[in-house]
Amino acid sequence: MVDATDPNTGNMMAGYVQGIVGQALQSGTQSSPIVQTHLLFNPQMKSAYNFVPGVMGLILMLICAMMTSISIVREKETGTMEVLLVSPIRPIFIILAKAVPYLVLSCVNLATILLLSVYVLHVPVEGSLWTLSFLSLLLIAVALSLGLLISCVVQNQVAAMIVSGMGLMMPVMLLSGMIFPIESMPAVLQWISNIIPARWYIQAVKKVMIEGLGMAAVWHEALILSGMAALLIGLSLKKFKERLE
């Protein structure tokens, strides 16, 4: 039986098995067995089963991080951020007010992707929607805090767009397992991929959405995403307070 969650890896593994069996048959030391290959989770080898979780991770990361950083930097460029900061409103509530619209937008995007995957691409959601939503909220929290951290470092919208857009798009696409299996990467790239939040999200979403597993199977990925979110939120708030001082 072959795990076909990733069609490319599934084909490769099936080919290896057939090659080993073929060598055993050529040796002539054993009777010819009947080889039956069973593809688990994705018997039709649809590529959509692989790229739908990847697209979810890519969109959530880019929209939250890029739009949040650009929005806050725009306020700094126009001078309205300073006006807001000298008001009686606490800075944390100002940041939350900027982040909430993109949180809602990301939830809408998540629902849209799931509807398209189920009704257009015919990729079922085998696991719990609550678990999938919880994992998505963790990634959104990571992306929002990363966008806030970027806005504290850069000085203008162009720089924010370059750092949050190009700086996140390529690592997410190449090092998260969205396109290339992580197991086939060089050891250095595998190590670097550990700090890519989308890697853990995509890995967990495949288990829940395609394999139908529950929270007990993705607690490791959820714990890593929670740690990343807490770390980035702490760094971004600290950096934001330093800029205020």
Regions found by a protein language model. Give the residues of each.
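Short cytosolic juxtamembrane segments of multi-pass membrane proteins
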Residues: 238-245
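Alpha-helical transmembrane segments and their short interhelical loops
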Residues: 91-165, 170-173, 215-222, 226, ...
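Membrane-interfacial helix-loop-helix junctions in multi-pass membrane proteins
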Residues: 42-45, 124, 173-231, 244
